[in-house]
């Protein structure tokens, strides 16, 4: 059976590339004058894959996703798969103060009302996928990240900014056949944290720092400064999601030799496409 996609407003930047490998279902998505969303499905079928990234405006993209799901069910589609390159609220995964919700749990339950399968990219806490009532898969785009940097690293190494991100660095390094490690963080004072790369010599080498999300970029800037002080030749920074605060792209770019993120969120440094990973993981089609 030919695979059919619906592209939400938050994934329009992926539509052209996806259309080279699969059919895009005809839809009409627009806004009423009062700001409410209007969705109409113009074709019928049985199985469909909806692609919707939920970056800012997060709530608008999420509500649109639900309305798309309802419209597809109304049009007779029986099996709905959802690909969410960037899942909003994924960092709100625990209660830190009494009276707070676990916001990502609420989002997962809401999506589960319409969608049978959920595919997300490099979610902040993979355990939160258990909140989704159906099949849920976390995809880490290690292959496309590795291929992008293959010719830039040579005899380099891959570093995680902390122990929690080590698995990401390991996956990329293993594809490239390179050494990997992480930074150890030690709090010296309430305002100062010491960062040290563990058990590696960076002098004269190109280094790639890998993380899931860049927001303010402060950690990456500090890590790059330390690596340069230790004699690193070039420092590259990559993340799956570029959730950049104002001015962060410029600040990080000044501190490193290259900054790149995937296109789960469209930014001016979204240089690495996740569409090949969608095709591999969801469609099992080489692209």
From Swiss-Prot:
Keyword Lipid biosynthesis: no
Entry's Gene Ontology molecular function annotations: ATP binding; kinase activity; magnesium ion binding; ribose phosphate diphosphokinase activity
Pathway(s): Metabolic intermediate biosynthesis; 5-phospho-alpha-D-ribose 1-diphosphate biosynthesis; 5-phospho-alpha-D-ribose 1-diphosphate from D-ribose 5-phosphate (route I): step 1/1
Keyword Repeat: no
Compartment(s) where it occurs, according to its Swiss-Prot or TrEMBL record: Cytoplasm
Binding positions (Mg(2+) 1): 124
Binding site for D-ribose 5-phosphate: 187, 211, 215-219
Cofactor note: Binds 2 Mg(2+) ions per subunit.
Pfam families cross-referenced by the UniProt entry: Pribosyl_synth, Pribosyltran_N
Residues the record marks as active site: 185
CC cofactor: Mg(2+)
Function: Involved in the biosynthesis of the central metabolite phospho-alpha-D-ribosyl-1-pyrophosphate (PRPP) via the transfer of pyrophosphoryl group from ATP to 1-hydroxyl of ribose-5-phosphate (Rib-5-P).
Family: Belongs to the ribose-phosphate pyrophosphokinase family. Class III (archaeal) subfamily.
Name of the protein in its database record: Ribose-phosphate pyrophosphokinase
Organism this protein belongs to: Pyrococcus horikoshii (strain ATCC 700860 / DSM 12428 / JCM 9974 / NBRC 100139 / OT-3)
């Amino acid at each position: 059976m030919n695979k059919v996609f619906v592209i939400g407003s938050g994934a329009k930047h992926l539509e052209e590339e996806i259309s080279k490998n699969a059919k895009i279902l005809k839809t009409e998505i627009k806004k009423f004058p009062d700001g409410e969303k209007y969705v109409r499905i113009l074709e019928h079928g049985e199985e469909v894959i909806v692609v919707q990234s939920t970056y800012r405006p997060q709530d608008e993209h999420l509500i649109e996703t639900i309305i798309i799901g309802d419209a597809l069910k109304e049009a007779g589609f029986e099996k709905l798969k959802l690909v969410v390159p960037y899942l909003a609220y994924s960092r709100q995964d625990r209660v830190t103060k009494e009276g707070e919700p676990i916001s990502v749990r609420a989002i997962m339950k809401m999506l589960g009302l319409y969608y049978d399968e959920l595919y997300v990219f490099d979610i902040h806490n993979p355990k939160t996928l258990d909140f989704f009532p159906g099949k849920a898969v976390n995809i880490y785009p290690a292959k496309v990240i590795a291929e992008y940097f293959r010719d830039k690293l040579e005899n380099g190494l891959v570093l995680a900014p902390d122990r929690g991100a080590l698995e990401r660095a390991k996956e990329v390094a293993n594809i490239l056949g390179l050494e990997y490690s992480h930074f150890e963080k030690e709090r010296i004072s309430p305002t100062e944290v010491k960062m040290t790369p563990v058990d590696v010599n960076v002098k004269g080498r190109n280094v790639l720092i890998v993380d899931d999300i860049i927001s303010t970029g402060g950690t990456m800037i500090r890590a790059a400064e330390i690596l340069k002080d230790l004699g690193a030749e070039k420092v590259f920074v990559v993340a799956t999601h570029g959730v950049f605060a104002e001015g962060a792209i410029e600040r990080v770019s000044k501190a490193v030799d290259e900054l790149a993120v995937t296109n789960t969120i469209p930014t001016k440094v979204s240089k690495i496409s996740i569409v090949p990973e969608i095709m591999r993981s969801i469609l099992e089609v080489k692209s």
